[in-house]
Regions:
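Glycan-recognition patch characteristic of GH18 chitinases/ENGases
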Residues: 25-134
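Aromatic-lined carbohydrate-recognition surfaces of secreted/lumenal glycan-active proteins
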Residues: 32-40, 171-204, 253-259
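Hydrophobic faces of well-ordered beta-strands that scaffold small-molecule active sites
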Residues: 33-35, 57-61, 102-106, 144-146, ...
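Substrate-binding cleft/loops of secretory-pathway carbohydrate-active enzymes
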Residues: 44-46, 190-221, 226, 262-283
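Active-site groove signature of glycoside hydrolases
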Residues: 63, 131-163, 216-229
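An active-site-proximal structural segment forming one wall of the substrate-binding cleft
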Residues: 120-144, 166-177, 198-213
């Protein structure tokens, strides 16, 4: 069975956007990078941060998720179960000792519309604010990063008009609580576009309304193509959302999210697949992902030629792979 696939390597770091001119004399590395430190890849992500400390000023440990059950808001620690032999205080001390600001990320760990409904009441918003603020103060974090993607990808866009004002009220309350203690509020969201263009993007996140009260906006300028082969973060699309962001808030608040991965789409299958891969090697199946730094070796291993797309400003390559083995009917 012959598989034909298309690979598009698209890094995850976050790059700060600044409109200030660079200094010509005595140039020093500018600490313009930030990045997520996932709980599931500490052995590689933490060394990567420390090896680039001259460029990185802050990190977002991707370690927490918000839950709501039994009328109680709680924040679940994802780090400890994944790293039982290394106490959470160890990497925190290492990063603090390196002079990094620590702004952990909290994801939405609730089911469809649960967080939206929670934020629809003053009591619900205050419960969420208190839980998050307590996490920050108890651990002496420098702030918090909200990555509540369920609004965009789970709840459905028909809920956005209802959710939007509750979200804005919540962000304002959380900002006030954090700022009262000298802490920062960072927001991570998918893209938005200038509504005057007729295209809004994920407008539920209300950038214009929350801009005055947030300290960081981290834009997910990746995952442009997921289900079908295509660019991961095409330049024109990225520029459009950035132009809108800096038109409504200082550029110093805006961080550009860059993908650190590529996607491997199966575009065509010839023949009958062996039984052990028949369910996964299917044209149109969910794309596998790989680490960006492995892209060149992957292409070389298949004898593929990497091509650069001038329009999208991304690289891509296609390759063929042959699978041998018995089919489900016993044929080889």
């Amino acid at each position: 069975m012959l598989k034909k696939a298309q690979i598009i390597p698209a890094i995850a770091v976050v790059l700060a956007l600044s409109l200030a001119p660079a200094m010509a004399e005595n140039p020093q590395p500018r600490k313009i990078y930030s990045g997520w430190v996932p709980y599931y890849s500490m052995k590689t992500s933490l060394p990567a941060v420390l090896n680039n400390i001259d460029l990185i000023r802050e990190v977002m440990p991707f370690w927490y998720t918000l839950k709501f059950a039994g009328n109680k808001v709680s924040i679940t620690d994802l780090y400890s179960p994944a790293n039982p032999s290394v106490p959470i205080t160890t990497p925190l001390a290492t990063m603090k000792g390196a002079g990094l600001s620590i702004i952990p990320t909290i994801t939405d760990g609730t089911d469809k519309l649960v967080l939206s409904n929670l934020l629809s009441t003053e009591n619900g918003r205050q419960a969420a604010v208190q839980a998050i603020n307590n996490l920050v103060l108890t651990n002496n974090f420098d702030g918090i990063d909200l990555d509540f993607e369920n609004f965009a990808f789970v709840d459905g866009n028909t809920s956005w008009d209802k959710t939007k004002p509750y979200w804005v009220a919540f962000v304002k309350s959380l900002s006030a609580a954090l700022h009262a203690n000298g802490k920062l509020l960072s927001i991570t969201t998918p893209y938005l576009l200038d509504p005057t263009t007729g295209k809004k993007g994920y407008y539920v996140y209300a950038w214009a309304e929350i801009a005055p009260v947030i300290d960081r906006l981290r834009i997910m300028t990746y995952d442009y193509s997921v289900a079908k082969p295509g660019p991961i973060g095409p330049l024109s699309w990225t520029e459009s959302t950035l132009k809108y962001a800096v038109s409504i808030m200082p550029a110093s608040k805006v961080f550009v999210g860059l993908a650190g991965y590529g996607r491997d789409w199966v575009t065509k299958v010839e023949g009958v697949c062996p039984a052990d891969v028949a369910k996964t090697v299917v044209a149109g199946a969910k794309a596998a992902t790989f680490v960006m730094s492995n892209a060149a070796n992957l292409a070389a291993g298949y004898g593929a030629t990497i091509q650069y797309n001038e329009t999208h400003q991304e690289a891509t390559f296609t390759y063929q792979k042959i699978y041998n083995g018995n089919t489900a009917t016993g044929l080889s």
